[in-house]
Swiss-Prot record:
GO terms for biological process: mitochondrial genome maintenance; mitochondrion-endoplasmic reticulum membrane tethering; phospholipid transport; protein insertion into mitochondrial outer membrane. The gene is MDM12. Belongs to the MDM12 family. Residues 1-266 form the SMP-LTD domain. GO terms for molecular function: lipid binding. This is Mitochondrial distribution and morphology protein 12. InterPro entries: Mdm12, MMM1_dom, SMP_LBD. The SMP-LTD domain is a barrel-like domain that can bind various types of glycerophospholipids in its interior and mediate their transfer between two adjacent bilayers. Residues 102-111 have a biased composition (Polar residues).
Length: 268
């Protein structure tokens, strides 16, 4: 079943948050000696929305619920990495959120006189639990996105001879589009009003890291080295390849299961 998205409603606040996530990842990424610090300066989602198809509807993965209980004091948006302890891990969770009510033994007396002491009266049955108006559910979506988004980055090309950082040339990079093909899990936890997001990969999530390039088979980048009012060198392959690797690594470390994002929704 296809799903239509109102892509135009993606606002600047989400773009600002994603810029912060990318800059955090870029700050921790190991850079080649010839590239200076990299910073994302702007992000535009573009006009091309992804093709989304609903492929499955199921119970929420147990990993989402357990992490939510352990990290209930965290901020409204968090990034969660899979725990190192893999004991009891269940890839396709079949977790029953319905809390069982313990059986209550009720002893009734044949003598129903009104003068029976209060402490000898039969205990009252507990009231039935209130039905949750927001049930838990998890959607699996197949996403095919030929994007025309635009991400602008700045960095510098370092010349380390005859001494370190002997010369620095400014670089402007623009990601002008990408292709994403994969499966996205969106889990809605109604009781706590939280949404968990992650990308599902065919590889074993706890196995050795594989080639995730198939999730982002194409990333289009334009590069300029030098100042705009002087000589400019365009489309430098080595710099563009480094940025492509960083983007793919960011997607893997931030969103590929068992890593996921949790968004805490405001109470209505």
């Amino acid at each position: 079943m296809s799903i239509d998205l109102e892509w135009c409603k993606l606002d600047s606040s989400l773009a600002t948050y994603l810029v912060e996530v990318l800059n955090r990842q870029l700050g921790n990424a190991e850079r080649p000696s010839f590239i200076g610090p990299v910073e994302v300066t702007s992000l535009d989602f573009g006009s091309a929305s992804p093709d989304v198809e609903l492929v499955d509807l199921r119970d929420i993965y147990r990993d989402f619920l357990e992490d939510d209980e352990e990290g209930s004091d965290r901020g409204p948006v968090k990034v969660t990495e899979g725990a190192e302890d893999e004991e009891g891990f269940e890839w396709v969770g079949e977790y029953d959120r319905g809390a069982s009510i313990p059986a209550t033994n009720v002893t009734s007396s044949l003598d129903t006189r009104s003068d029976q002491p209060d402490d000898q009266k039969a205990p009252l049955l507990p009231p039935p639990p209130a039905e949750n108006p927001h049930p838990n559910l998890q959607l699996h979506l197949h996403v095919n996105w030929h994007s025309n988004l635009r991400i602008t980055l700045t960095t510098s090309l370092l010349i380390n001879y005859p001494s370190p950082m002997f010369m620095s040339l400014p670089i402007k990079l623009s990601v002008t589009g990408l292709i994403f093909i994969g499966e996205l899990a969106v889990a809605y936890e109604g009781e706590r009003r939280r949404v968990h997001l992650c990308i599902l990969d065919d590889l074993d999530p706890y196995g050795p890291a594989g080639d995730r390039q198939r999730l982002l088979p194409s990333i289009y980048i334009e590069s300029e080295i030098g100042q705009a009012d002087k000589h400019v060198l365009k489309n430098v392959t080595r710099v563009e390849r480094f940025i492509q690797d960083v983007i793919r690594k960011t997607v893997e470390e931030e969103l590929v299961f068992p890593n996921f994002h949790t968004i805490v929704m405001a109470d209505s």
